[in-house]
């Protein structure tokens, strides 16, 4: 993998910059997570492949969604969702330029209302983690919620 001047792999640097919302300290913290690019890709994969409620069970044992990795996954998912909203409104606002084509393609399967509601749901589930709600329950509720919102906001 190519490395940037900071010694961070280019894919991680790009993902970290997208996830950090302009905060350098946060970008450095995120870029030290070697699994960040994988987590970002996994968020896109899950949104692409979550089609029906029976699909939820197949993601419950995903290592990207386990207790230790879930906060980073929620960050990556938030960025993907924000970029999907940008793809529907103003493509110049997409932050994850390295995944622009995938994000634009993925966004076609969601309405703008659905994306906004799913982003809200992600933040609600993030709050539950801070109240020590079990990660499996958070993941299950999140994935089922995504399906429900996507269906209701067609």
Model-derived segments and their meaning:
Residues 1-76, 80-154:
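Charged, glycine-rich active-site and insertion segments that engage polyanionic ligands
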């Amino acid at each position: 993998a190519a490395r940037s001047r900071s010694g961070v792999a280019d894919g991680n640097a790009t993902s970290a910059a997208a996830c950090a919302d302009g905060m350098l300290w946060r970008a450095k913290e995120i870029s030290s997570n070697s699994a960040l690019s994988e987590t970002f890709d996994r968020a896109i994969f899950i949104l692409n492949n979550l089609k029906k409620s029976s699909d939820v069970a197949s993601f419950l044992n995903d290592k990207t969604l386990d207790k230790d990795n879930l906060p980073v996954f929620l960050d990556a998912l938030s960025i993907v969702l924000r970029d999907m909203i940008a793809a529907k409104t103003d493509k110049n606002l997409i932050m994850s330029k390295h995944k622009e084509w995938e994000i634009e393609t993925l966004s076609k399967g969601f309405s703008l209302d659905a994306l906004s509601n799913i982003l809200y749901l992600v933040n609600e589930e993030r709050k539950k983690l801070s109240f020590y709600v079990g990660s499996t329950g958070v993941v299950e509720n999140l994935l089922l919620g995504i399906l429900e919102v996507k269906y209701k906001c067609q």
